[in-house]
Amino acid sequence: MKRSKVANASIYFNIPEPRNQLLKNGIVYTCRHKKRINTGVTVARRGDFKKSVKLAIVDVRYIGRVEKSQELKPYLKESGFETTKEWGSKIKDGLPGHLYKVRLSL
């Protein structure tokens, strides 16, 4: 039997703005406080480890470390947020963080 090429570590989208951006437009830039161990194809989910809902299969790519919210400006249009200040305020545990490009995978 052929093994799935989906990575083990799911990526969670519990904040509506980036989740809706991803599902409506097929792409979202997301900033996470902790650097992910895995990138590549994985499952996007909503919820937590005990109870979650599968949203889609996605491809996660690391962009780089972000120190200040102003550095998010080039990615704002595809973040789901209106301002970098709003986006920065939603990053769990705040900045610095790690920026990822997440696309729906075919």
Regions found by a protein language model. Name each.
Residues 2-106:
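Structured alpha/beta reader/binder surfaces that contact nucleic acids or chromatin modification marks
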